[in-house]
Amino acid sequence: MKTALAAAALCATVSGAAAETMLHLSETATVTVAPDRLVAVVRAEAAADSAASAQDQVNGLIREAVALAKAASGIAVATEQYNVWRLEPKNGAPSQWRASQSILLHGQDGPTLLQLAGALQQHGLAVESLGWELAPETARSARTEAENRALKALRGRADGIADAVGLQFDGYRSLTVGSAPPGAFRARTLAAASLAAQSEPSAEAEDVRVDATVEADNGLKPR
């Protein structure tokens, strides 16, 4: 675990007739977690003399891709943005239309998803991006662990500083806990040549950092 000190301040405040010593501290803790969910974005694209023809081709590719994905155990699939646009003609050539749509695939069984991505490539789709991330439940657990570590470190520092100045901890006067989102979708964009790939893609997992920061005004009192 890595921790980092953000700020520390000791001051005396007056509440009624009694003076109270306030200690402001901030502490950050980091946990490192192995990602456990593979995410891929796969795109179908086609060009034709008419918008309808281009869309028909894309629709067929997407239907086939979704069917293959649903047949793969443990893989979730969702269709994404659909685009149709006209290509400006050049040198007197007839105009063309292009259509595209992407699908999002994710699952915790990496080999199965990679095999599926390879099969979709063979059916004429392109793998746009591929990467590992934390599943939601894993991210929540890591965030809780980071927060608990930061809180423990902050309380330990508060006790240590209080003892050094002849006082003792007397509770939090304010407490803020914040967590940065874990390293999102560590994707890599693949070249257009992936359309014609003869083997399934690969994706190496890299550990993800999850940070949590706590900030508190700590009341101190005489021993």
Residue positions per predicted region:
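Short, charge-dense linear interaction motifs
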Residues: 2-3, 8, 15-223
